[in-house]
């Protein structure tokens, strides 16, 4: 295989290969999601598939035996942001109901009962060792009672508390099977209510360990035995970008989460527009939505995923060869070197970039497991790295999103009418706070607009402030407007040219030219049409070109 080429930039590491190499099975599922939803946002679907592949692998307690970090679990954290109507809910339902439903049933009905019974017997035996007065039946009943008291294992959940997460973790440790899978929809609306739980997930990412909280032991609330072990966790946060990155407290909390450690743990997807591809007729759309090949592929992939719920595949420990480990370490070194090139204040970007290789390793493990491989190959690594690189670009879209002042300036310029403070408060969720805070935000918007071709004007009527704005169109030097004629006053027709060709006009003999156009093509000040994109300096010899 051709050695990959690495090239660093100030924002993200560009990892390129001879051709784009996404994981084959993942792309097959993505093709199905594209066909079913008619949405062309493939990166969103790739992350969605990556999450569910990792979920399947971690439920089966798949681990990676690395040569440098020891044994680590396969798991993935994902943040996927797309506008409403882009197919988030539809594609998620397809994954749950058509792709992994067979696996879910087989796992809950066969794998979980089998391994939980074995673990309960083992724990009961340990209890007997500690307390010889217990017979095997008594010890087994005690452990079974504790296990049942922890409730039914949740295959996935959409919210919770830190104590509930730790209780679920205790259930997983006693079962010695399964993983915790948080799937939080409308993350912008639900982030603040789940901060405590998300902080716990922060600790669980690397190896699936978290310290228990010290609680008072009472007769009614007995502190249970702390079991040592690892419990893999997966997380998928999805919603709309405008709700999460709203310039208010929610966005501040989210940015703090990234700084705290989620930047290095998550794969990112950020799309501000819906891509639907080429337009179709109603009949073409019907044929695409009812294509039998798509349904056939879904059934084939569902069966493949369902067969992964096999006792022989449980607790798979994936390995890497020396060459493939070196291949990954090369990527790790390049990630770290590229992160060192970032500015000192870009801590969040540094963390995301420096740990990108680790996310790729975990994802490669998921790819290897669903393919039925016992080893992580270079193909798995390159596929995972490709997606992590895409994630890095989307992460920078998230972290470099325009500030509230820029959005305020654009709103005033694009609304097309005068607005008052009342309009701003009603229309813009980020335009909040005290009068002085809003005044400062508006001041920043005016300053930002000044450097970004936006003019904001203020007028006052009866002490009421009216704001209006306009955007100056950026000049395209390949389409400059110029009028010229071989007559000094007549025949000045409008033409467009690029800047590189202007010297032919200015050097032509007996040719007159202007930056303006004129009514009736007649050159006269009173007939000039307002607007120009070319500035002509008439210098008669008082300035040296040198």
Name what the model sees in each region.
Residues 1-475:
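Phosphate-handling catalytic cores of nucleic-acid transaction enzymes
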Residues 476-546:
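Signature for HUH/AEP ssDNA processing cores
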